[in-house]
Curated annotation (Swiss-Prot):
Belongs to the IPP transferase family. GO terms for biological process: tRNA modification. This is tRNA dimethylallyltransferase. It holds the Pfam family IPPT. Its EC number is 2.5.1.75. Disulfide bonds: none annotated. It catalyses: adenosine(37) in tRNA + dimethylallyl diphosphate = N(6)-dimethylallyladenosine(37) in tRNA + diphosphate. PANTHER family: TRNA DIMETHYLALLYLTRANSFERASE. ATP binds at G19, P20, T21, A22, S23, G24, K25, S26. The gene is miaA. Residues 44-47 are annotated as: Interaction with substrate tRNA.
Length: 317
């Protein structure tokens, strides 16, 4: 059921908690799951990786023991885990959950949330051999050179992509090499989301900017105290492709540079803090422009009150 302003008012089939990093999403998700018999489901592209428990701010083992947590730390860093992988895993998990269990999706990755409801483009899987060939060809090449190569093969995609966006330029090159088609030609066909058409409570924790900045900076220092450098050192020893998502996580490039001896520990911390602050700003911007009016921009306490009100409503009301 909807109110006159278009907002859902009845009991939701799932709760979606998004927001910038360090905004209190995990704590709210755990609170809801404990109070209402829910399962906390990771919706963050870095917290899926087993390699980055500390640096991705995954829930602690103690927190995971207080309520069921799923899709956390289940993927090896060598895997290029995509939104398509996430959507399939989330759909499978939802089909396995007991009817009375409340799914509580928690994270900061906008495309993951979109895949749950609106669905995603049906992009083909790129064979590992093709991906490796493109990576070898691109090794040592400036991104602008790769963009020029894309313009010759797939001018439509090159027109849409910034010449400095290496990750997306590489993705377009891989898709074209694997299929002979523009990546844009796959965007019309969509895979529907597993929560499409269901009543949802969508919460975006819009923490005050200066307070968020201070929390981000303090949290990065705490991560260092909790072993983030050792975590990255172990990742560095694996010598993974630097374009893999796990190698581009906030804090990883700077800490690797410190381990390589090119910058100091303090410079690595400052770089990680700055990268994370800029990411939080992009999260605000993306959700504001991409996710529509169905999302409640709120604080953790106001969100908790809203959850209590919605979950006390009879089904179908």
């Amino acid at each position: 059921m909807q109110s006159p302003d278009g907002q859902e008012t009845g009991r939701p089939a799932a709760i979606l908690i998004a927001g910038p990093t360090a905004s209190g999403k995990s704590a709210l998700g755990l609170r809801i799951a404990r109070a209402f018999g829910g399962t906390v489901i990771n919706t963050d592209s870095m917290q899926v990786y087993a390699d980055l428990r500390v640096l991705s701010a995954r829930p602690t083992a103690e927190e995971e023991g207080l309520a069921p947590h799923r899709l956390y730390g289940s993927i090896d860093g060598a895997v290029n885990f995509s939104v398509g992988h996430f959507q399939r895993q989330a759909a499978a998990l939802l089909s396995e959950m007991d009817a009375g269990s409340l799914p509580v999706f928690v994270g900061g990755t906008g495309l993951y949330f979109r895949s749950l409801d609106e669905g995603i483009s049906d992009l083909p899987e790129v064979p590992d051999a093709v991906r490796q060939r493109i990576r070898i060809e691109a090794d040592g090449q400036p991104t602008e050179t790769l963009h020029a190569a894309l313009a010759l093969r797939d001018p439509e995609s090159a027109e849409r992509l910034r010449p400095s966006d290496r990750m997306r330029v590489m993705r377009a090159l891989e898709i074209h090499a694997a299929t002979g088609r523009s990546i844009g030609s796959f965007h019309e066909a969509r895979v529907p989301g597993p929560l499409a058409g269901k009543p949802l409570l969508k919460l975006f924790l819009a923490t005050e900017r200066e307070a968020l900045r201070q929390r981000i900076d303090a949290r990065f220092v705490t991560m260092m105290e909790q072993g983030a450098l050792d975590e990255v050192a172990a990742l560095r020893e694996r010598r993974l492709d630097p374009l893999l998502p796990v190698m581009r996580a906030h804090g990883v490039p700077g800490l690797i540079a410190h381990l390589d001896g090119t910058i100091s520990r303090q410079e690595a911390i400052q770089r990680g803090q700055g990268d994370t602050r800029r990411y939080a700003k992009r999260q605000f911007t993306w959700f504001r422009h991409q996710m529509g009016e169905a999302w409640h921009w709120t604080t953790p306490e106001a969100a908790w009150s809203l959850v209590q009100a919605r979950l006390s409503a009879p089904a179908g009301r």
